[in-house]
Amino acid sequence: CEKLSIGLTYRSQITMDVKNGTATFTVPPSLASNFPSGPFTSTLPLPQVATLGLGYAVNDKLSFAFDANFIGWKALDTIAFYYKDTTASLKPTKLPRDYKNTFAFRLGAQYNVNDKLTVRAGVALSLTPVPAGYVTPEVPDANKVNLTCGVGYKFSAHFVADASLTFENLTRTDDNIALQLNGTYKTYILAPGLSVIYQF
């Protein structure tokens, strides 16, 4: 079918190694010998990602695109820091994450109003990999819904401008098992974008 296009991509899991990090502890002078500053090592696995993309041109003016991602966050079970110099008080730091595999979905539409003006709109759903009890302040993740809109204008054969706007609003209340931190995390994003392209 000439109107339908399909694409598949896969990115394997990658492990990032920290081989010579520097750990610095700010503690009262009386405890400084128990928490010596020095090198540490760690590893951070980045998840595998498989993507299916579909595109469909209804006619010369209207087209749709759909993406589905499988993200292997289960690889991130624990973040651990191993210190070269340990004491009775300073042991390897292990932060449990227990993330789960998850999915993300995106749907977008583009409409060519005329030869110069194009309008776009989209919605995305990202399911959180963070289970209950493992939400942390640095990554207060929750299921996310993004709404986007945009407009493009072709001023000439060489000059094109595009503007976009992304909106995201999420809230999650959770208890962290390891850190004993309870709280409600709120994120509000309103991100405008502008690009200008000039082709020689």
Describe the role of every protein-language-model region.
Residues 1-200:
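Outer-membrane beta-barrel porins/channels
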